[in-house]
Amino acid sequence: MKRLLAATLSVSFLMAAAASAGDAIAVSTSSNGGRASATATAVGNASSVAIAGATRGGRAVATSNAVGERHGYADSRAVAAADRGVALSDSRADARGLFGGSAIADSESIAAAIGGLAISHSAAVADGTFFGHARSRSASTALSHYGVSVSDSIATSRGLFGGHASSNSDSTALTYGGVSTSRARVISDASLHASAESNGLGVSISGLLLRSDSRVHAESRSVRFGSSRSDAVMIRVRP
């Protein structure tokens, strides 16, 4: 597991360095029979980075997509690293803004596997619309050492007609020879000068031949000068 964490950390540093160099960057590297594929897409006012690395027969696929456009900004990052295992990482950030509104979406997905299967999916949407303001952040991490690890994080937000909306979603799944799944769903709305904030955190850790599941759902909506906030946290550990 130490090798797995070290490999993931080194790839994350590489991703941070690459992110400052351009809007859409895809990097893939493989050795000793490994297969790696990286795809990055950025449309307007957006940054997208995808990095995949595989070795010793491992398979790594990283897909990053960011849209942004007009008064919206989207930042998407995906990393997949596999050593004799399979790592699939998918990250999507949307944003938009539309007609005077502003939106920021940030999405990060990391999947790393040693002889196992790691699947990570992250999506952050946000909107804005007219004079609304929306901010959305989603992070997903799946780490597997001869087991199955699945992490799924989705953060939405809206804002709409002058409101402020904020969403934060964080999901982590870690296993050592077992099965670990973590899913976090966060929604926020607001409208007409209202404010809404929602935060969700899900963590799942499992040991040898054990199964651990974590499910988190946080939802907050406000209408006409209202204010709402919701927070949800679920941490499950089976060592």
Go through the PLM ranges and name each one.
Residues 1-21:
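Gram-negative bacterial Sec-dependent N-terminal signal peptides
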